[in-house]
Amino acid sequence: MTSLRFVITATLLGSTIGAPAHAHAAAQWKTDFDKHTVPLDEITSGGPPKDGIPAVDRPVFVSVAEADEWLGDREPVVVVAYGGETKAYPLQILIWHEIVNDEIAGLPVSVTFCPLCNTALAFDRRFDGRVLDFGTTGKLRHSDLVMYDRQTETWWQQASGEGIVGTYAGRRLTLVSAPLVSWKQFQQEYPEGLVLSRQTGFSRDYGRNPYQRYDTRKGPFDHFFSGRKDGRLPAMERVVALAEADSSVAYSMSALEDRPVLNDTFSGRPIVVLWAPGTASALDASAIADGRDVGSTGVFGREIGGRVLTFESAGPGLYRDAQTGSTWNVFGRATSGPLAGQRLDPVPHGNHFWFAWAVFMPHTRVES
């Protein structure tokens, strides 16, 4: 339970844990350090050793009713829906483990969260004809989690899904849609869903935020961030972040709070970006359930049945399309009207801190 606190305490005390991570790494790694796509001196130690922040490899799930005994209505959860199954991964657990290796309806996935970057992302673990299992290296690059796969010990940048050191350097993992929403929203939308339980095999103070007030800072810890800060937005602004091929875009979440629907075109595809109130920041108050409201987001293709829909707000957490007058929710489901029951196709996205998106996607388009 002390490993995460050590990261923060060491940083604040100005320790030397920001030293190059590869300097003494060879003995504990089978990684090919001669193969890399980034300068090795950009990778620094975050404090904990290899697997010092332990991934959850044997996740246990409970019902919505059971999880409701220990989850607050506004607590953030990562949602993965695939093949008729839906699971919620509470940030109160991910904040202590950062990686959950799981399978949903036969699809091997890794659900990940880097608290220092607010990056909650899920990846398809099928890669190059095998299934990868991921762990934490104990390293950071530009303040972001560097993961490794246990099959080749390639190091992967969590915020981008890119292999940066080792066998798969230069290759990318495939994102799986994993929106970050409130527990109450998940309960209402998926009452029969499953929830990652606190039965992780580890003793942690689940529900407590070890990064208290982190997201009220003006920027990331200097020890862990050596990149250029992009002044187009405040460093700790949350953005809805999308990338595909050579295109990327970031939508300011504070702007979405004022205008909760944005119709756009990304990479040639008509999309809609939705924002809804009611989700707590996991990186604010000491108790995650008490964090300030930062909202939840959904991103979807807005073409259905061969026609492109245009959306507008229909009240907090509700949206209406101009073509049919159907009402939709933040999960992209029509709740009433001619299209009731239909769902829009989700577009994988993250709710990154701006500094963490801009440093990896410096040419990104910004909508603020």
At which residue positions do the language-model features occur?
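Mid-to-C-terminal functional-domain signal that highlights helix-capping/loop sites
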Residues: H22-S368
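Positively charged n-region of N-terminal signal peptides that target proteins for export
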Residues: M1-R5
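Bacterial N-terminal signal peptides
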Residues: V7-T16
